[in-house]
């Protein structure tokens, strides 16, 4: 197996405040969310995934989405998520009246059974919604990001064929979308499959910003992220302490413990590989400790416990 090549720089999107805490059992205060977001932004992360614009009756954690955005410095690049046209309209209103929103994620599961379970829509019906959302966001100069979930499979359907994923990419590209995420929603990917899918996608659509988003159910999240980087991806998602993962609302059977790639551990690995992220690791570790304090428990960062490798230790 050939080792992936390392680029000179990578942009890391910090997902703690959105994908990280969406399923957290306690609703956090706006102030606590902003404390962690502010610390993460101060470390130099390239983008913050800050909130979901979904009904509070569905996800109470994001009832304060506008208030959270209002508390984030304008210099910080912001991503949010929504799932329908009504939410897209709300995103546009926040963009115009609260603060700039740079990207808005729109989930679209490559597995149709997963899309039905997660969003209650078959592919054909979801395409109608997504097309309207893309138009609504684009008219407001917000970059629509199609998040192709279950890109490597899901427990309901099993394997998802690459042609299905590429069919969604081609459809989105035809709608003018130039930001596309491949998500390993239930931790079924492996580095070889990641390399194959992203290599083909980057070659076929070279003007698309492809984004890698891995859940770490089976402990290969960082390996998969590095494989994506080696295949040409230059934007990757991670979450402080590895918080987050697959929403519990999806009925998909027992898939074990979920979680995102740990931002601190990923950035430490990239730093050791001399890949620039623009992130100050010490400041990021501080943000991770603050996230632990806010959530009231130890999280999953190994670098927080063992410390980063010092160059003098390498022989």
Regions picked out by a protein language model, each given a short descriptive name:
Residues 1-315:
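Catalytic cores and adjacent flexible loops of soluble metabolic enzymes
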């Amino acid at each position: 197996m050939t080792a992936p090549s390392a680029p000179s720089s990578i942009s890391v999107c910090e997902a703690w405040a959105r994908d990280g805490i969406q399923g957290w059992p306690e609703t956090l205060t706006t102030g606590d969310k902003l404390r962690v977001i502010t610390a993460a932004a101060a470390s130099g992360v390239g983008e913050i995934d800050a909130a979901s614009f979904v009904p509070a009756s569905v996800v109470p954690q994001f009832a304060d989405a506008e208030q959270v955005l209002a508390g984030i410095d304008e210099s910080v690049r912001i991503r949010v998520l929504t799932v329908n046209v009504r939410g897209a309209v709300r995103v546009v209103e926040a963009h115009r009246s609260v603060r700039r929103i740079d990207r808005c994620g729109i989930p679209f599961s490559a597995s149709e059974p997963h899309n039905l379970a997660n969003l209650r829509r078959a592919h054909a019906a979801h395409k109608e919604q997504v097309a309207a959302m893309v138009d609504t966001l684009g008219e407001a100069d917000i970059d629509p990001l199609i998040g192709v979930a279950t890109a490597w499979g899901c427990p309901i359907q099993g394997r998802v064929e690459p042609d299905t994923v590429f069919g969604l990419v081609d459809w989105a590209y035809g709608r003018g979308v130039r930001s596309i995420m491949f998500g390993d929603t239930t931790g079924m990917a492996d580095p070889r499959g990641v390399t194959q899918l992203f290599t083909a996608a980057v070659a076929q659509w070279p003007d698309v910003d492809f984004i890698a988003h891995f859940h770490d159910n089976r402990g290969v999240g960082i390996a998969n992220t590095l494989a994506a980087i080696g295949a040409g991806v230059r934007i990757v998602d991670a979450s402080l302490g590895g918080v987050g993962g697959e929403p519990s609302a999806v009925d998909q059977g027992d898939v074990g413990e979920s979680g995102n790639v740990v931002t601190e551990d990923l950035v430490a690995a990239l730093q050791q590989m001399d890949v620039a992220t623009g992130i100050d690791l010490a400041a990021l570790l501080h943000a991770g400790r603050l996230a632990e304090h806010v959530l009231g428990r130890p999280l999953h960062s190994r670098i927080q416990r063992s410390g980063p490798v010092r160059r003098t230790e390498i022989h």
